[in-house]
Amino acid sequence: MNLNPVRVTVIDTLTGFKFIGDQIAILEEKGREDSFIFGFEESCGYLSGTYVRDKDAVNAAVLIADMADYYKDKDISLLDRLEELYKKFGYLISYLGNYEYPGTAGLSKMRSIMENLRKSTLLTKDYLNETDMLHADVLKFDIKDFGTAIVRPSGTEPKIKIYYFAEGCDMIDAKEKMKKLTVLIERMLN
């Protein structure tokens, strides 16, 4: 699959619009803020343009309305267009798993889980070891033939959050990979 036919640079950041805003600031320092096209995160937050540095639901709604109008003139529904994109680029699905560990014992359990996950041979990247702006208590697992899982403790709640991503040649394939991925990672939590 050709995942980047228009040669757009994709910059990965940690979850949160603070980090997307940081990327815009870096572009500004280079005099290239106009090259920022679109930012998004897993929780359905979107940002187009550089004038707002946070989730912009109003702008996202206008973009969707414009897109619906554009495709309506071509007699194509947004769902039909989405299906075309899936067929061209692959079916990517995501899931956010929240694993709660209440109380003082829960906090200790969360620390233990993160320590054990850091020892896993499946670990791809430990952002706690990063020296750049991506330094955080976040772990990334890229697991061949399954997908990607990004693990972090919540900063505000007694839970571990896991962002799961699986890609398949069709929706059934993607869902099967997602199921295998979540089972594998959940076993690692015990």
Please provide the spans of the model-predicted regions.
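Phosphate-binding and adjacent anionic-ligand microenvironments
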Residues: M1-S154, K159-Y163, D170-E176, T182-N190
